[in-house]
């Protein structure tokens, strides 16, 4: 991965890491499924009138939108509703990186080398350290945990659909894919919110919406979705999944740090240790081969 693309990947990590703080603020005055529906509605409109529809098979477009946009967030919100704490949920969700690597190996025949396996194993251990520390002393319902894993698997499936789309003969512009696929989850989210929250709650949240919620929606729609998924999709189309997917493991690290800075949540020593393990594993996985070549040249 080039240095420029590495910087872009880290930008996405920071944007998505801040997501959890923004979501927490946005949910103060709005039901989660409705917030998600409005998020994707802002992504799609009015941009859809100015961006051409991606020329890819409809089944791939539907698969992408239903997995990475609807299923991921529907499973995640239901998991939290069934007792999964938000903090640990953000960590367990990063299992998507490993699901993506496995699915990429089966779908595209991508091969992993020893250095990549070692780096991924180290990063996995770091995530387990973070999860163990976050779950310590908290009762987590197994259903909530399994639903969070389902959300992670949905994200991974979306990554595979993204790579298939970007490898198609009529490769679309990434922004076109992000905007048009945002149409797909809007109605499912609003219907789910209507069933779970009721029309009175939905109407009340719209009537009483404040500037904080509006700014949260703008960040989630324009920064986290259009910019974040736009860059992420470009990188997945350019590199092997094992180079890109593990970078998302840095998201909970940024999430923990931003929560400590912005929400005054303290970072424990074990969380810091887990974050260091993840960053070391990612460095080996993504830049290990380049570092090895550089050493040979210098030698």
Per-region residue spans from a language model:
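Hydrophobic alpha-helical transmembrane segments of multi-pass membrane transport proteins
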Residues: 10-18, 22, 62-83, 129, ...
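Membrane-interface helix-cap regions at the ends of transmembrane helices
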Residues: 18, 22-25, 29, 42-57, ...
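Glycine-/small-residue-enriched transmembrane alpha-helix faces in small-molecule transporters
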Residues: 1-34, 137-166, 187-191, 297-299
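Membrane-interface capping segments at transmembrane-helix boundaries
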Residues: 286-298
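Hydrophobic/aromatic residues within transmembrane alpha-helices
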Residues: 26, 35, 79, 106-108, ...
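Hydrophobic alpha-helical transmembrane segments of multi-pass integral membrane proteins
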Residues: 4, 34-47, 63, 119-122, ...
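Specific alpha-helical transmembrane segments that line the substrate/conduction pathway
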Residues: 34-42, 77-111, 116-120, 151, ...
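Hydrophobic transmembrane alpha-helices of multi-pass small-molecule transport proteins
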Residues: 41, 47, 103, 112-134, ...
